[in-house]
A protein has these predicted regions:
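Bacterial N-terminal signal peptides that target proteins for export
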Residues: 1-9
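Intrinsically disordered, low-complexity regions
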Residues: 2, 13, 22-25
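Bacterial N-terminal signal peptides
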Residues: 8-17
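Carbohydrate-interacting regions of secretory-pathway proteins
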Residues: 21-247
């Protein structure tokens, strides 16, 4: 009888814990509201988001899916922006702190871009500074670029993240953060660890751009404001708890 009671009690604890975690997803605490945080994804609808190539949210079959409080780009055989395509916030942002949870599948590639202006005729994917989302162990992009600057949490093709010990395994939720200060100081964070920082618009930043694939774009990453973008790179990647506050 005691063992049955223990099992039942444990099951009840797990159920309560799971319900509590689910209730906290895509919500703001009173403290966060007071601090000026706003949800960019409400967990139920595509409100506040649109296609990077159209004024409406993409309706492609097997594209962006909203289910159980999670926004997922579904797999389309690794083709970059060839199915649903990238999505961007309707609003534009300058100085801000952006938080987001992401979950990779094996070999997946995606990205969270910022200061996206949508003015460049860039082909598949819209142009902007990118917090790289990647399965470094499997996806070949991790070995391209320079000194690992295309790996997870890096400033894509520009600066490598120092994330040793901060990464949770593929299939688990990780938390990313991008902080852009009014003085153009930028930081990338992963699971509570600062993994890189740089000064946007600085001579050092512009030297990094000159050595990258972004050098073809005039004043790359230097817009005063831009959209936040979630990338469709043809692999299944999920997002939730996307929130922002402006400085």
């Amino acid at each position: 009888m005691n063992s049955i009671l223990k099992v039942s009690t444990f099951a009840l604890i797990l159920l309560i814990a799971g319900t509590a975690v689910k209730a906290q997803i895509n919500t703001l605490s009173p403290k966060e509201k007071k601090e000026g945080w706003k949800l960019l994804f409400d967990g139920k609808t595509s409100t506040g988001w649109r296609s990077a190539r159209a004024e409406t949210f993409p309706a492609a079959a097997n594209g962006w899916r909203i289910k159980d409080g999670v926004l997922t780009i579904q797999s389309s055989n690794g083709a970059e922006s060839q199915n649903a395509g990238d999505i961007v916030t309707v609003g534009e942002y300058g100085a801000f702190e952006l938080n987001f949870d992401f979950k990779l599948t094996r070999g997946a590639n995606s990205g969270v871009k910022y200061f996206v202006t949508l003015k460049e005729n860039s082909g598949a994917s819209a142009i902007g500074l990118e917090y790289q989302i990647l399965d470094d162990d499997v996806h070949p992009d991790a070995k391209l670029g320079r000194d690992g600057n295309r790996t997870l949490a890096s400033l894509y093709d520009l600066k490598t993240s120092n994330k040793a010990g901060a990464v949770k395994p593929v299939g688990q939720w990780n938390t990313g953060k991008v902080i852009v200060r009014p003085d153009n100081h930028v930081e990338h964070w992963l699971n509570g660890v600062k993994v890189l920082e740089y000064e946007r618009k600085s001579p050092a930043y512009r030297e990094l751009v000159k050595m990258s694939k972004h050098k073809i774009w005039k004043d790359f990453g230097e817009a005063d404001k831009g959209h936040i973008l979630l990338q469709d790179h043809g692999n299944e990647v999920s997002y939730r708890n996307i929130k922002i506050r402006e400085f």
